[in-house]
Amino acid sequence: MKRLAVLGSTGSIGTQTLDIVRKYRDRLEVSLLAASRVSEKLLDQIDEFKPEYVYIAEGEKIKGVKTLIGEDGLYKLAQLDIDLFINGISGINGILPTYLLLENNKKLATANKEAIICLGEIYGDKYSDIFPIDSEHSAIFQCLLSGRKEEVEKIILTASGGPFLNLPKEEFRYITPDQALNHPRWKMGKKVSIDSATLMNKGFEIIEAHYLFNIPYSKIDVVIHPESIVHGLVQFIDGSVISHLSPPDMRIPICYAISYPERWEIDVRRLNLAQVKNLTFLEPDYDRFPLLNIAKECGEKGGACPTVLTTADEIAVNLFLEGKITFDMIPVYIQQVLDQADFSKPETFEDIIFIIKETEKIFWNILKLQNVN
């Protein structure tokens, strides 16, 4: 019986993880559920899966279950004897639990890009033990099994292009949050859906791939693939290319992260290539989606830059979702913050937290000067 901790259990990754648990109750046991707060959904999960522990970021103890609360609770969470921690927390909130789990040498499967990116400068040497849940990085992981690292010529990440792949740039300012959240292929949370619409998500994945697989940026490419069938490719020095194909369903990489090195049957739509008919691959349009290049440049620069990028993006996305800035201004504000930020390379976790807080101050000062409330 494999014991799981599901961090972000009420979110998109968490609920799909629990779908896998439902199918394999004879193999999987939920030891801990973690969420930001008590909700009806969390209480329903507790009732169904009966974990020994529950973590909430804030609130009161939950009757009938060992409850861990706040930052002190996170430190206790990271010391629990659990076989696999699944981090489905969205955004910068996923950084501290990731740091603590790495510090305690816990087995971790994660979908939290921000933590991988921000902690990469100081914890990259521990990333070889992390199992990626992202469909693209799960695909690359599997493709890399076909050869040795020194035989890899390049890796290729695919991007759907999001809901605005063919929308003229001059219309970006009129995009609404509801339109941006309506991804044509994937069912995701709000933050990652907006990042997919701006292609920042793919920019993050470039940096993530660099850290997870210890691959230089010069060997990481991106192509637009609207069908979202091919999730990643690896080209080897003999000219061969190994690719990973599957229907666009996050339960596939989640289940693989749980079952590895085995593969377990799951109830997802099977791929029928005759019905797919066409697989399209396009060069990214860096003019319409500048965050892709901005992210890669931040990764290449290293130091504090990736942390500044993730912090600025999180604020910009939230402002857009709140209707305070337009869609086309997301990359503009992020670039303005990057231009003003000047921090030393982080050496400790405390340095990363300092960079995050100072970046937030820079962003809010920019907004204040431009009378954005």
UniProtKB/Swiss-Prot annotation:
Binding residue positions for Mn(2+):
D134, E136, E205
Judged by the first EC level, this protein's enzyme class is: oxidoreductase
**Pfam assignment, any one:** DXPR_C
- Gene Ontology MF terms in the entry: 1-deoxy-D-xylulose-5-phosphate reductoisomerase activity; manganese ion binding; NADPH binding
Pathways per UniProt: Isoprenoid biosynthesis; isopentenyl diphosphate biosynthesis via DXP pathway; isopentenyl diphosphate from 1-deoxy-D-xylulose 5-phosphate: step 1/6
* Residues binding 1-deoxy-D-xylulose 5-phosphate: K113, S135, E136, S160, H183, S196, N201, K202, E205
- State the needed cofactors, names only: Mg(2+); Mn(2+)
The alphabetized UniProt keywords are: Isoprene biosynthesis, Manganese, Metal-binding, NADP, Oxidoreductase
Where is NADPH annotated to bind?
T10, G11, S12, I13, R37, N112, E114, G189
Its Gene Ontology biological processes? isopentenyl diphosphate biosynthetic process, methylerythritol 4-phosphate pathway involved in terpenoid biosynthetic process
Query: Which reaction is recorded as catalysed by this protein?
Result: 2-C-methyl-D-erythritol 4-phosphate + NADP(+) = 1-deoxy-D-xylulose 5-phosphate + NADPH + H(+)
Alphabetical list of PANTHER family matching this protein: 1-DEOXY-D-XYLULOSE 5-PHOSPHATE REDUCTOISOMERASE, 1-DEOXY-D-XYLULOSE 5-PHOSPHATE REDUCTOISOMERASE, CHLOROPLASTIC
**What does this protein do, in the record's words?**
Catalyzes the NADPH-dependent rearrangement and reduction of 1-deoxy-D-xylulose-5-phosphate (DXP) to 2-C-methyl-D-erythritol 4-phosphate (MEP).
Protein family membership: Belongs to the DXR family.
What is this protein identified as?
Answer: 1-deoxy-D-xylulose 5-phosphate reductoisomerase
